[in-house]
Swiss-Prot record:
A motif ('KMSKS' region) lies at residues 259-263. It comes from Latilactobacillus sakei subsp. sakei (strain 23K) (Lactobacillus sakei subsp. sakei). Coiled coil: none annotated. The keyword Cytoplasm applies. Gene3D superfamilies: 1.10.10.350, HUPs. Belongs to the class-I aminoacyl-tRNA synthetase family. Glutamate--tRNA ligase type 1 subfamily. InterPro entries: aa-tRNA-synth_I_cd-bd (IPR045462), aa-tRNA-synth_I_codon-bd_sub2 (IPR020751), aa-tRNA-synth_I_CS (IPR001412), aa_tRNA-synth_I_cd-bd_sf (IPR008925), Glu-tRNA-ligase_bac/mito (IPR004527), Glu/Gln-tRNA-synth (IPR000924), Glu/Gln-tRNA-synth_Ib_cat-dom (IPR020058), GluQ/Sye (IPR049940). GO terms for molecular function: ATP binding; glutamate-tRNA ligase activity; tRNA binding; zinc ion binding. This is Glutamate--tRNA ligase. Disulfide bonds: none annotated. One of its GO terms (cellular component) is cytosol. Signal peptide: none annotated. Its EC number is 6.1.1.17.
Length: 495
C-alpha cells in the first residue's frame, strides 16, 4: 500500500435495516475514498449478538448497492485485512487484551452486575456522576491475585477493564468540529474492553480493527464523540497512532425540530421504505449527500461523479442537517421527470399490481394501457407508488360530485357543453385523444363557449375530478362506455 493512501470504512451493525443516518455515513466515506482514489472498506460490527437480526447484514449491503455505492474490501470482497466481520476476529482480539493485562494496563474485574448497580445508585443518591470504583484500591499484588482466585472459585466470570491514567487529557483535532478534549477523570472510570463472554466491547474492537486495517480517517456521526476518548485511551495503551476523526452533525427532523430518531414514526427513515415507494436510487443518493455537506455553487442536483469530484470533508456543516420530507419529494420528482419512461413504467406498474389495481402477469393490452396511464403522471409523481392514488379515478367508480364541483357546473353553459360532448362522442368510432380533442374544439367553434366554461365541465363530468393530467388522454384511457356513463350521471345531477 502506498504511504499515506487514504483508507476509510463504514462499519454497520446488523441490528436493523439501513437507516438514513447510517446511509449518510456510508455515503460520505464512499465519496471521500473515491475523491482521493483511496480504499473504501465495509466491516460488519456484529459482536452484539443479542441485538443482531436475521438478514441484517444482507439488508445493509443490498441497500448500499442499490444507492449506487461499491466498495473495495468487505465480507463479500475479501482483501488483505480480513476477516471483515468482528465475530470472526475473536482470535485477533483475545491475545491483544491479554497483552494489556500482562503489562498492567488492563485487569480482570469480578464485580457483579448487582454490585455495579448498587454502586451507581449510591452515587446517584449522593448527587455524583456514575463511575466505576476500582475494586482493588489499596491492595498489594498478592492480595489482588488472591481476590481474583477467590472470585473464580465462586464461578464468577470477569470482565477486563482498561486502566485509565489520572489527570490525563485526551485531545484530537476533528475535521468538522476542530479541537476537542476530554479529561480522563470524567470518563466514568476504568471501562470494560472485554465482556464476560470473552467478546471485546465496541470501543476496544473498533480500535484494533481500524489499526490493523490501516484506516486513515474515521468519518462518523457525532453521537460517537463520547466514544472517541475511550478509543484514544486504547490507542495510547498500545502505542498506536490514531486515525484522523471527523464527526458529522446530527440530522434533525424538520417537522419536529428534534433529532431524527428510529422511534420517530412521523417520517420514513429506512432506505428499504423508500425503495418500496418507488424512490429512485440516484435521487436518494443526491438528497442524502446534501444532508450536512454543501457543494460549491447553488445547484442542488448532482450525479454521483459530480459529487465525487467535489467532495471535501472540510465542507461538512457544523450545524445540524435538516431532513425535509418535502425536499426529498422535490428532488425525487426532478429525477422521475428526467428518467427513461420505461424505467418509471416498470416501477409504477409494480405499485399498481401490488395495490391490486392491475392483475399480476397482465396481458399485452393491459400493459400498453398502463404505459399510457403512467406516462400521463410521470412529471407529477414525487415517487412512483403515488400512481396508485393519483390514478384512482381510472380504477374506481366515482362517488357523487362534491359541492365545489357542483358549484362549478351551476351555470347555463355547462349542460349545453355536456350534452353536445355526449352526443358527439356516441358517434366517435376511433376513440383516441386526438379525435377527442377535435370534438372539444368543434364544440368551441359551434357554441362559442371556450376556456374554463368549456374544459372544466368536461373534466368534471368525465373524470369526476376538478384537476388532473391531459384531458383528452384521460378520456381515452377511461374508455368510451365509462365516459358516456359519467356524462349521463353528471347531467342527471345538475338538472
Amino acid at each position: 500500500m502506498a504511504k499515506n493512501k487514504i483508507r476509510v470504512r463504514y462499519a454497520p451493525s446488523p441490528t436493523g435495516h439501513l437507516h438514513i443516518g447510517n446511509a449518510r455515513t456510508a455515503l460520505f466515506n464512499y465519496l471521500f475514498a473515491r475523491h482521493n482514489k483511496g480504499t473504501f472498506v465495509i466491516r460488519i460490527e456484529d459482536t452484539d449478538t443479542k441485538r443482531n437480526i436475521a438478514d441484517g447484514e444482507n439488508s445493509q449491503l443490498d441497500n448500499l448497492k442499490w444507492l449506487g455505492m461499491d466498495w473495495d474490501e468487505g465480507p463479500d470482497k475479501p482483501g488483505n485485512y480480513g476477516p471483515y466481520r468482528q465475530s470472526e476476529r475473536r482470535e485477533i482480539y483475545t491475545p491483544l487484551i491479554q497483552e494489556l493485562v500482562e503489562k498492567g494496563l488492563a485487569y480482570e474485574s469480578y464485580k457483579t452486575e448487582d454490585e455495579l448497580t448498587a454502586e451507581r445508585e449510591a452515587q446517584k443518591a449522593a448527587g455524583e456522576a456514575p463511575r466505576y470504583v476500582y475494586e482493588y484500591e489499596g491492595m498489594s499484588d498478592d492480595e489482588i491475585k488472591a481476590s481474583q482466585e477467590a472470585a473464580r472459585a465462586k464461578g464468577l466470570q470477569p470482565v477486563v477493564r482498561l486502566r485509565l491514567p489520572k489527570d490525563h487529557v485526551y485531545k484530537f483535532d476533528d475535521i468538522v468540529k476542530g479541537e476537542i478534549s476530554f479529561e480522563s477523570d470524567r470518563l466514568g472510570g476504568d471501562f470494560v474492553i472485554m465482556k464476560r463472554d470473552g467478546m471485546p466491547t465496541y470501543n476496544f474492537a473498533v480500535v484494533v480493527d481500524d489499526h490493523l486495517m490501516e484506516i486513515t480517517h474515521v468519518l462518523r456521526g457525532d453521537d460517537h464523540i463520547a466514544n472517541t476518548p475511550k478509543q484514544l485511551a486504547v490507542y495510547e495503551a498500545f502505542g498506536w497512532e490514531p486515525p484522523i476523526f471527523g464527526h458529522m452533525t446530527l440530522i434533525i427532523n424538520t417537522e419536529t425540530g428534534k433529532k431524527l430518531s428510529k422511534r420517530d414514526e412521523s417520517v420514513l427513515q429506512f432506505i428499504e421504505q423508500y425503495r418500496e415507494l418507488g424512490y429512485l436510487p440516484e435521487a436518494m443518493f443526491n438528497f442524502i449527500a446534501l444532508l450536512g455537506w454543501s457543494p460549491v455553487g447553488e445547484s442542488e442536483l448532482f450525479n454521483r461523479q459530480e459529487f465525487i469530484k467535489q467532495f471535501d470533508p472540510r465542507r461538512l456543516s457544523k450545524s445540524p442537517a435538516s431532513f425535509d420530507q418535502k425536499k426529498l419529494e422535490w428532488v425525487n420528482n426532478q429525477y422521475v421527470k428526467q428518467s427513461d419512461p420505461n424505467k418509471i413504467m416498470d416501477l409504477s406498474l409494480d405499485s399498481l399490481i401490488k395495490a391490486g389495481k392491475i392483475a399480476a402477469n397482465p396481458d399485452s393490452k393491459t400493459i400498453e394501457w398502463a404505459r399510457h396511464l403512467i406516462a400521463l403522471y410521470q412529471d407529477q409523481m414525487s415517487y412512483t407508488a403515488q400512481i396508485v392514488e393519483m390514478s384512482d379515478v381510472f380504477f374506481e367508480e366515482p362517488e357523487q360530485l362534491d359541492a365545489e364541483a357542483l358549484e362549478e357546473l351551476n351555470n347555463e353553459t355547462a349542460p349545453v357543453v355536456l350534452k353536445e360532448f355526449s352526443e358527439r362522442l356516441k358517434d366517435l368510432t376511433l376513440f383516441t385523444a386526438p379525435r377527442i380533442m377535435q370534438i372539444i374544439k368543434g364544440i368551441q367553434k359551434d357554441t362559442k363557449i371556450k376556456g374554463r366554461l368549456l374544459y372544466m365541465p368536461i373534466r368534471i363530468a368525465t373524470t369526476r375530478e376538478m384537476h388532473g393530467p391531459s384531458l383528452p388522454d384521460s378520456i381515452e384511457l377511461l374508455g368510451k362506455d365509462r365516459v358516456l356513463a359519467h356524462l349521463e350521471k353528471t347531467l342527471a345531477e345538475i338538472k
